[in-house]
């Protein structure tokens, strides 16, 4: 007890975080280390690294130049997103009508967001420069010689080569992911739509009005709340069935093909893989034509008497001479799920085949000796093993299906027309996912403000589902390890 108590009292100190390390280095640094926070090159000059001083001074100077000539002018207008509309004015000097010096709201928003990121990057970089100079200071205090520029380059080509490799990808993530994400979030709090399109018109901040509109608080005439509930419900239903029908369908197909009683397993496996070889968009466009009101499949059903039978039992309206596979909500939802099974099951079959082949043979043999039948072995051994291995894959498949644009859009675009006026007023359809509704709002109706809100909601749905699922998966990950 005494030893354990003493060990607890003498635990190793925690590694300081980034801010704590910067604070320590700045306080204990010499004058050059402190000055490097404000002028990056001064610290390196004082510590004998002239080439590095030139490089960091150039980077800092370029960033400050951008802020001075592009950042600050736009940040000054960030609160209003511009006040001067584009119009023609008479120029006395040329005696002609010319375009005035107008404000572009989107340019102001874009440059402001980039400026915020540049400012944050400058502060973080300045803190790292201070820590770097403090390390140089400590080396010089011990009488050792600091690295020259060539030696520093060699370090980043050897010991710290990971930094060199990650530099471009990180810049790509910032430019193509972080900046657009911030702009998306910002647009959700503006009135950016077809009536406020730059450069001819200005848009401005509207606070949480767009979110109130989405959740039914936009007044008596607003239908976005109703449409959002309908579309979100179908999105989750679709994602559930699209994920698990493919999952279990692929498992069953893999088990049947790999069964010892199955003849020519390689032939059947190759046959089902044909759907993978054909590009998905080609398959979807062809199938859309097959299942159209006047398509081949409807002709076959009508000639076989299936259409008449479905009319007699009430599944097809009496006034129709076809089965509305892609033109009525219920039929369209069912058809889309069935077509997705045809497209997705072969992928899952290949994955399940690999996993089933890796189930320990002694586990199956022990179950067989204990008298387990095939059904019991499936539910007690094979399915739990598959779930333990493919749990993370199922989560990503669900998120992928929430955002499965191709299947829904290519099967229904130009074919399905909603009869629901409330949905039509919100530019939505019964078969829309959140992502296809978002796409239609931007491309067809230029309603960027509501599309941005929907984008945020899609992220929230996917993030919450992923966090919850991985929380439970991590609890059970050691079951079959």
Q: How would you describe each model-predicted region?
A:
Residues 48, 69-87, 117:
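Transmembrane-helix bundle segments that line or gate the permeation/cavity pathway
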Residues 2-32, 38-45, 50-53, 57-65, ...:
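N-terminal signal-anchor/first transmembrane alpha helix
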Residues 70-78, 161-481:
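A structural signal for multi-pass alpha-helical bundles of membrane permease subunits
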């Amino acid at each position: 007890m005494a030893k354990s108590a003493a060990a607890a009292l003498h635990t190793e100190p925690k590694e300081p975080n980034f801010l704590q390390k910067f604070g320590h280095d700045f306080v204990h640094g010499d004058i050059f280390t402190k000055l490097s926070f404000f002028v990056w090159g001064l610290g390196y000059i004082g510590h004998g690294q002239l080439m590095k001083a030139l490089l960091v001074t150039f980077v800092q100077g370029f960033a400050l130049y951008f802020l001075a000539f592009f950042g600050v002018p736009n940040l000054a207008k960030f609160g209003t997103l511009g006040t001067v509309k584009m119009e023609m004015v008479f120029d006395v000097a040329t005696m002609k009508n010319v375009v005035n010096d107008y404000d572009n709201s989107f340019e102001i928003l874009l440059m402001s967001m980039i400026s915020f990121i540049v400012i944050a990057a400058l502060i973080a970089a300045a803190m790292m420069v201070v820590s770097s100079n403090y390390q140089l200071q400590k080396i010089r205090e011990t009488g050792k010689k600091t690295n020259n520029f060539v030696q520093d380059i060699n370090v980043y080509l050897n010991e710290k080569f990971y930094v060199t490799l990650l530099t471009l990808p990180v810049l790509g993530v910032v430019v193509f992911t972080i900046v657009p994400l911030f702009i998306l979030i910002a647009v959700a709090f503006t009135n950016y739509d077809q009536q406020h399109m730059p450069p001819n018109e200005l848009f401005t901040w509207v606070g949480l009005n767009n979110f109130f509109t989405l959740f039914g608080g936009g007044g008596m005439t607003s239908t976005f709340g109703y449409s959002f509930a309908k579309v979100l419900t179908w999105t989750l239903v679709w994602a559930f069935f699209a994920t698990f029908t493919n999952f279990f369908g692929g498992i069953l197909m893999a088990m049947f093909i790999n069964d010892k009683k199955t003849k020519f397993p390689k032939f059947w496996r190759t046959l089902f893989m044909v759907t993978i070889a054909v590009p998905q968009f080609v398959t979807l466009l062809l199938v859309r034509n097959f299942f159209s009101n006047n398509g081949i499949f409807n002709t076959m059903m009508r000639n076989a008497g299936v259409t008449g039978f479905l009319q007699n039992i009430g599944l097809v309206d009496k006034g129709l001479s076809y089965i509305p596979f892609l033109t009525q909500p219920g039929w369209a939802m069912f058809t889309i799920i069935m077509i997705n099974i045809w497209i997705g099951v072969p992928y899952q079959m290949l994955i399940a085949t690999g996993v089933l082949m890796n189930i320990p043979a002694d586990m199956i043999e022990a179950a067989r000796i204990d008298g387990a039948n095939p059904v019991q072995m499936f539910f007690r051994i094979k399915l739990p093993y598959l779930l333990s291995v493919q749990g993370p894959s199922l989560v990503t498949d669900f998120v992928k299906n929430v955002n499965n644009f191709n299947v829904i859009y290519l099967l229904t675009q130009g074919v399905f027309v909603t009869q629901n006026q409330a949905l039509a007023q919100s530019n939505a359809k019964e078969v829309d996912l959140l992502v296809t509704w978002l796409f239609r709002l931007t491309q067809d109706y230029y309603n960027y403000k509501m599309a941005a809100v929907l984008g945020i909601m899609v992220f929230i749905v996917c993030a919450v589902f992923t966090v919850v699922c991985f929380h439970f998966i991590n609890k059970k990950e050691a079951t079959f390890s």
